[in-house]
């Protein structure tokens, strides 16, 4: 049996309308161990799809990410390459946003893409996700919503 996803107290506070609903309630849990059939684990990758660590490794081990596939839908996960520079990351996020728009039946759980080994901060990545964040089926980390 899979472990349950874990939300921090802060995430739960905002998800339940904390502080008059200043932040959206579409917040991902800090620790994702399982997904519903319509949920997709969105993770940062490299263009070569070498899923060695972090969320990429979780996607590979748990949610069907394919070794050697650095972008797009794979199993119950979606890879966004974040290691090839800011411009390429923005383009990949644009492609993800189009895909999310085309699939309103899916719930996209976007991890803190780019904020691990790629070296970006939430302040750098969150604005790139502004269009995706407007979609009702896209859920983001609280660190991105707070930017």
Segments the model singles out, each with a brief description of its role:
Residues 2-147:
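Macrodomain-like recognition of ADP-ribose-binding/processing modules
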């Amino acid at each position: 049996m899979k472990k349950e996803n874990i939300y921090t107290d802060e995430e739960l506070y905002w998800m339940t309308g904390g502080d008059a609903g200043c932040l959206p309630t579409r917040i991902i849990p800090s620790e994702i161990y399982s997904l519903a059939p319509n949920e997709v684990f969105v993770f940062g990758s490299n263009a070569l799809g070498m899923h060695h660590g972090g969320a990429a490794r979780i996607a590979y081990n748990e949610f069907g990410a394919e070794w050697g596939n650095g972008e797009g839908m794979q199993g119950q996960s979606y890879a966004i390459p974040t290691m090839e520079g800011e411009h390429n990351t923005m383009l990949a996020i644009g492609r993800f946003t189009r895909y999310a728009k085309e699939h309103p039946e899916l719930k996209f759980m976007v991890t803190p893409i780019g904020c691990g080994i790629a070296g970006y901060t939430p302040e750098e990545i969150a604005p790139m996700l502004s269009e995706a964040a407007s979609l009702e089926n896209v859920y983001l980390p609280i660190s991105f919503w707070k930017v």
